Regions:
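Auxiliary Fe-S-binding modules of radical SAM enzymes
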Residues: 1-13, 187-289
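Conserved strand-turn element in the central/C-terminal portion of the radical SAM core barrel
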Residues: 105, 133-137, 157-181, 200-206, ...
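Catalytic cores of alpha/beta
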Residues: 110-115, 173-191
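Hydrophobic faces of well-ordered beta-strands that scaffold small-molecule active sites
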Residues: 17-19, 64-66, 96-100, 126-128, ...
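Aromatic/hydrophobic pocket-lining residues that form the small-molecule binding cavity
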Residues: 49, 81, 111, 150-151, ...
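Conserved, mostly hydrophobic/aromatic
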Residues: 25, 33, 49, 68, ...
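Conserved SAM/AdoMet-binding glycine-rich loop
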Residues: 57-160, 239-240
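Canonical Radical SAM [4Fe-4S] cluster-binding loop centered on the CxxxCxxC motif
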Residues: 5-48
C-alpha cells in the first residue's frame, strides 16, 4: 500500500488492511504524544483513497478487516466517508469489520443520523482516547477536551449503535494526581460503558513537552509500586458491565485481561500478587509503544 509518513494502528488491527484516509492528527498537541509529528494534518484526496482500495483488491485474496488511518478519519465530510465505505463493501464483500480512530471533536461534528448511516454502511467501531477522567490531568496534557465532553461523545457513539473502544494511560497524572486520575478515569469509563477498555502505561517519548517536564523535574513519573496502586484503585472503581478490559499493551508492566464486572475480582487478585512480588512485572527494557 501507499503510505505517507509513519502509520499507527491499534494493536488489534495488526492483521487489517490499513488505508490512510487522512494524514496525521487533527489535534496533535497532546503533551505526552510523539505520533504524527512529520507534518500538519491534511485530508487525503478521495480518489487516492479509493484507488488504494482498488489496488488492495488486486493484491489480497481476502480482506476480513479494514482500518481507516490516520489519527482522525471521522473528520472527513460525511458523504466522502459514505463513498469510502460503499467502495469497501463493493470491493470486499467478505469484509467483516471496518474501524477507525475518532476524536471527541470529530464525533461532535457528526450528527447522530450521520453516525447511524456510517454504522449501516459498515463502520463497526471507533477507537477514542480518553487518556484520563481527571480534568486537571487533561488540561496539563493539552488534550483539548474535558472529561464530560469526552464521555458525552463516547455515549453518542454508543447511542448510534456503533461499538466503542476507549483508552486511558496509567501514570498520566503523576504521583500528585494518582488517586484522582485513577478514580475519575474509572468513573468516565463507567459512564460510557464501552465495548472495550484499553489501558496503557505512560512512557516518555523524546521531543514531547512531557519529556522536557520530566527532565526539568516539573513532572514525576510513577514508580512500579505506584503504578500498581493506581491500577488497583482504577479496577476497584470500575463498574462497566460487559466491557472487555485489556491491559496487555507493550507499555504495561502488568498484563490484565478480563470482562467486567465478571472478572473484576480475579484481576484484583492478579494486581495484589504483583504488589507482593514485583518480579511478576515486565522488565523496563521490554516495554515499548
Amino acid at each position: 500500500m501507499r503510505y505517507k509518513g509513519s502509520v499507527y494502528r491499534p494493536p488489534s488491527e495488526a492483521y487489517s488492511l490499513i488505508v490512510q484516509v487522512t494524514y496525521w492528527c487533527s489535534h496533535n498537541t497532546c503533551a505526552f504524544c510523539s505520533m504524527y509529528k512529520e507534518k500538519h494534518f491534511a485530508i487525503r484526496p478521495l480518489e487516492e483513497v479509493l484507488e488504494d482500495f482498488r489496488i488492495a483488491r488486486g493484491v489480497y485474496r481476502r480482506v476480513d478487516r479494514v482500518f481507516l488511518a490516520d489519527g482522525d478519519a471521522l473528520v472527513r465530510k460525511a458523504n466522502e466517508l459514505y463513498t469510502i465505505l460503499d467502495t469497501i463493501r463493493e470491493l470486499f464483500p467478505e469484509c467483516e469489520r471496518v474501524t477507525s480512530y475518532a476524536s471527541p471533536a470529530s464525533i461532535r461534528i457528526r450528527t447522530e443520523e450521520e453516525l447511524r448511516t456510517l454504522r449501516d454502511k459498515g463502520l463497526t467501531m471507533v477507537y477514542m482516547g480518553l487518556e484520563s477522567g481527571c480534568d486537571d490531568v487533561l488540561k496539563r496534557m493539552r488534550k483539548g477536551h474535558m472529561s464530560a465532553e469526552i464521555v458525552e461523545m463516547g455515549r453518542k457513539v454508543r447511542r448510534c449503535g456503533m461499538a466503542l473502544s476507549v483508552t486511558a494511560i496509567t501514570g498520566l497524572g503523576g504521583p500528585e494526581l494518582l488517586e484522582r486520575h485513577a478514580i475519575e478515569t474509572a468513573e468516565a469509563f463507567n459512564a460510557m460503558n464501552p465495548e472495550y477498555i484499553g489501558m496503557l502505561t505512560l512512557m516518555v517519548e523524546p521531543e514531547t513537552p512531557l519529556y522536557d517536564w520530566v527532565r526539568d523535574g516539573s513532572f514525576q513519573l510513577l514508580t512500579q509500586p505506584q503504578v500498581l496502586e493506581e491500577t488497583r484503585l482504577l479496577m476497584e472503581h470500575l463498574d462497566s458491565p460487559g466491557s472487555v478490559f485489556r491491559m496487555n499493551h507493550a507499555s504495561n508492566y502488568l498484563v490484565l485481561k478480563g470482562t467486567l464486572n465478571r472478572d473484576k475480582e480475579a484481576m484484583l487478585r492478579t494486581i495484589d500478587a504483583a504488589e507482593h512480588d514485583l518480579s511478576r512485572l515486565r522488565p523496563e527494557e521490554w516495554r515499548g509503544l
